[in-house]
Amino acid sequence: MRKLLIQIIRLYQRFISPLTPPSCRFYPTCSAYGIEAIETHGAIKGSYLAIKRILKCHPFHPGGVDPVPECQHTKHKKTP
């Protein structure tokens, strides 16, 4: 599922985005944010974060730098 969502975003970046003027108010762009969010948090939470970000992309939001939040869970190594 993760790979499929990333491929859809990459298709958008390659074929649709070049046809429109640059208008993203954020860094990284919303599509780059979506890919990073899905890679970092998985398909469900990453998609949620990407949609939440896209909904903030409008003329009344100041934009700016908005990095993908770090993963909150940590994996514990078992020690012998």
From Swiss-Prot:
Localization annotation: Cell membrane
Q: What is this protein called?
A: Putative membrane protein insertion efficiency factor
Keyword annotations from UniProtKB, A to Z: Cell membrane, Membrane
Q: Which NCBIfam families match?
A: membrane protein insertion efficiency factor YidD (TIGR00278)
UniProt keyword annotation of Hydrolase present: no
InterPro entries given in the database record:
Membr_insert_effic_factor_YidD
Matching Pfam families, A to Z? YidD
Q: Which organism is it from?
A: Shouchella clausii (strain KSM-K16)
Which family is annotated?
Belongs to the UPF0161 family.
Cite a GO CC annotation.
plasma membrane
What role does this protein play?
Answer: Could be involved in insertion of integral membrane proteins into the membrane.
Protein topology in the membrane: Peripheral membrane protein
